[in-house]
Regions:
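Short, polar/acidic, helix-capping and beta-turn segments at strand->helix junctions
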Residues: 1-114
Length: 114
């Protein structure tokens, strides 16, 4: 069975299938903020969506982080390192990509295990 969370015409915020939860790329609600604050905002959104499906960040198995500018790598990691619990870091890739809104500095896509 496939379950779609907060579906819209173009995408669902999350999809549950085969024991995994796939979150769509999460983007900041505070586009005028710096990369650290934008990252913290996105991570809070991830926490909220995981809570909605009955999970916590400890269940995250894979993450892809898109940065508009790799110069923000350390600033992004400042928020990330405060958020990830010791010994619970998921597999992760961080890449530079042009994001849909030029004010966004970060987008994060997550896969978690049920």
């Amino acid at each position: 069975m496939i379950q779609r969370i907060q579906p819209s015409k173009r995408y669902s915020e999350a999809v549950i299938a085969n024991g995994l939860v796939f979150l769509s790329g999460m983007v900041p609600d505070n586009p005028d903020a710096d990369a650290t604050a934008q990252t913290a905002n996105v991570l809070a959104q991830i926490d909220a969506l995981l809570t909605e499906v009955g999970l916590t960040k400890s269940r995250i198995v894979d993450t892809t982080i898109y940065l508009a500018d790799m110069a923000d790598y350390n600033a992004m990691n400042a928020a990330w390192d405060l958020w990830v619990a010791e010994g619970q870091a998921p597999a992760r890739a961080t890449v530079e990509a042009r994001l849909a809104d030029p004010l966004w500095k970060v987008e994060i896509k997550v896969t978690a295990a049920l």
